[in-house]
Amino acid sequence: MTTQANASVRVEILAREDCPNRGMALVVVERVVDETGIPAEIEVVEVASDEDAEEHRALGSPTVLVDGRDVDPDPLYSDYSADDRIYKTHRGPSGWPEPEWIRDALLRAVAHTTSNGTH
């Protein structure tokens, strides 16, 4: 789990402990947060079962949420699950989301926070 002080955006990586793409999802999220300079709290949330997945709104492992919203603009799945997740990216199938999706989600979250006067 990684956090930054004065976080304004919440980023959750929902994943099983044994998920083969959990580590790479975290690396990509941290890299995008660093590149954008957007203050964010990054948390890895254990999703051990389909019940956990439903509770946390995970469409597979790993799922990346920014302020509670999936970063994938066009998810392949609609059911909550702790199974491995495949993302449809411009590179082809991938086990983690595109950095651009994470960046766009962070920018939307900041714009939403600012427009609501809560920033």
Regions found by a protein language model. Give the residues of each.
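Non-globular targeting/processing and membrane-anchoring segments
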Residues: M1-E41, V45-L59, T63-H119
